[in-house]
A protein has these predicted regions:
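C-terminal non-catalytic regions of proteins with extracellular/luminal or membrane-system context
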Residues: 1-278
Length: 278
């Protein structure tokens, strides 16, 4: 039975030095051809994960899914790794990451809710064969920012095998077209070489237009040895400071001061500056 299988897994985990649990979705619960009615992991996977976590303090939970799923035990897991849907070498790649031969340096391209009920756009549903995007510009992480709520994991989130300190940032000046460069100095404060994805977001709280609370303007990946500092150079293009004018049917720029923020995700920003565009 399922209960017996879960109990056997817990016993095996307790007898081991460490445990790895792989959970996720399948083609029966997740597909490109249809929407999901739930974000919960299928079957008794949550019970399995909790049983192993309770039996073995050194447990890594690997989530094999193509999109956000609910992880109600995430606060209990010492390590959580999102593996997505890998190809034929996914097993070898996962082994490299688990053994430390490779660093898990990816970043989330979506925001993960703590629960389906907590998603800001949960009530957006098609009616009469037509889906109206009433949220407008506030899609994805922008919806959470507008609602002022905290997801389980923000867009852009991701950890590796080292730690990073954000030390300084220089933004601008902006050119005639509005584009500018952001230079962010980060330091590897851990004990292993690592890769960091420095993300730059813009804000315009005094705008006369409807805008997201903040939006991604650019990013750059850098690598550094333990103790070393490195500069990430992020090119912010013209389009990042422009807005679409429905009346004029084209991209336009609102002159003024933009707030520039740099950090590790849409919800973890370490440095702040400003740049003025004309």
């Amino acid at each position: 039975t399922t209960a017996e299988a879960v109990a056997a897994a817990a016993r095996a985990a307790a007898a081991a030095d460490a445990a790895v649990v792989v959970a996720g979705t399948t083609e029966e619960s997740e597909s490109e051809g249809r929407d999901r009615s739930t974000l919960a992991l299928p079957g008794s996977q949550d019970a399995l994960v909790r049983a192993v976590l309770g039996a073995q303090p050194h447990t890594v939970v690997c989530v094999n899914a193509g999109g956000p799923v609910e992880l109600p035990w995430r606060g209990e897991a010492p390590a959580l790794l999102l593996t997505w849907f890998g190809g034929q070498e996914s097993g070898a790649g996962l082994a490299d990451v688990l053994t430390g031969a490779a660093e898990p340096s990816g970043r989330l391209p979506t925001t993960w809710p703590a629960s389906l009920e907590g998603t800001p756009v949960r009530e957006t549903r098609p009616a009469g064969g037509r889906l109206v995007y009433e949220e407008g510009l506030h899609l994805g992480y922008r919806a959470w920012l507008r609602a002022g709520t905290e997801p389980a994991f923000w867009f852009g989130h991701g950890l590796g095998y080292t730690r990073w300190a954000y030390e300084s940032m220089e933004a601008g000046p902006a050119g005639d077209g509005g584009a500018f460069t952001v230079r962010v100095r980060v330091r590897n404060t851990g004990e292993r070489p690592g890769r960091e994805v420095v993300q730059v977001y813009l804000e315009r709280p005094d705008s006369a237009l409807e805008r997201p609370v903040r939006w991604l303007a650019g990013y750059a990946a850098v690598e550094a040895e333990p103790g070393a500092a490195v500069e990430a150079v992020v090119r912010v293009g013209t389009r990042a400071v422009e807005h679409w004018s429905v009346e004029e049917r084209g991209w336009r720029r609102e002159p003024g001061v933009f707030t520039v923020r740099a950090g590790r995700s849409a919800g973890d920003l370490r440095l702040t500056g400003t740049v003025e565009t004309r």
